[in-house]
Amino acid sequence: MARPRKPLLSRDRIVGAASALVDSEGLDAVSTRRLAAVLGVSGPSLYNHFRNKEEILDAVADAVSVQVDLSMFEESDPRDWREALHDWALSYRAALAAHPHIVPVLARGPGRRPAGLRVADAVFGAMTGAGWPPAQATRIGALMRYFITGSALGSFAGGFVDDETAYDPADYPHLGQAHLLADHRRQVDEGAFETGLRALLDGLAIQYGQYARPTDGRPSTA
């Protein structure tokens, strides 16, 4: 019998199958046995491409990081750091919102993941390029990751049930409309993220004049 022209298995195929499982069923659904069954191969064959399940999940996480737009850091003037961070944060959150089950893996940090490291490098480079001292640029990167991944770990509006009787006014006098939140989940959650992001960036802009080193010989401005 003729040998197949292409290998039956590849890293991309494994990552694609694992990503689909994570998206549909969550992290616990991923195992080498389950992946092998989905891919129609033997379990040990996966180890020709990945050492263990954690490496597979890292690759799934990195595939999400690839979706984050970094062009604003390459195209913007260094002094436009605030708007660049804003646009990047929206892109990052959109990528996480599309794949919420992988967020706990991404929240651990980039580790050795190439795409994740490119994100960290782009943010740090943009901040130091705008005049932020390296130590403060590091803190900004950490702050943004905490804020973005934290917002993607769960829905505030989705945490309230669509049942008016759950919020007895005798017990919760200020939650009379809480049962309506679930129907407006996207509006509430995206609005909250934008409000928090603007407040965060406004605060950084105030600090900018205190910390930043001029990038062009002129006084730094907030």
Language-model-detected regions and their locations in the chain:
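C-terminal peripheral helix-coil segments that are non-catalytic and often amphipathic
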Residues: 157-222
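Actinobacteria-biased recognition of intrinsically disordered, low-complexity terminal regions
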Residues: 1-8, 12, 74, 209-222
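Amphipathic alpha-helical interaction segments
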Residues: 13, 55, 87, 118, ...
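Hydrophobic alpha-helical connector segments
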Residues: 70-115, 134, 144
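Hydrophobic alpha-helical bundle segments that form small-molecule/ligand-binding pockets
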Residues: 117-169, 182, 204-207
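Helix-turn-helix
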Residues: 13, 17, 21-59
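Short, basic, alpha-helical segments at the C-terminal edge of helix-turn-helix-like DNA-binding modules
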Residues: 63-68
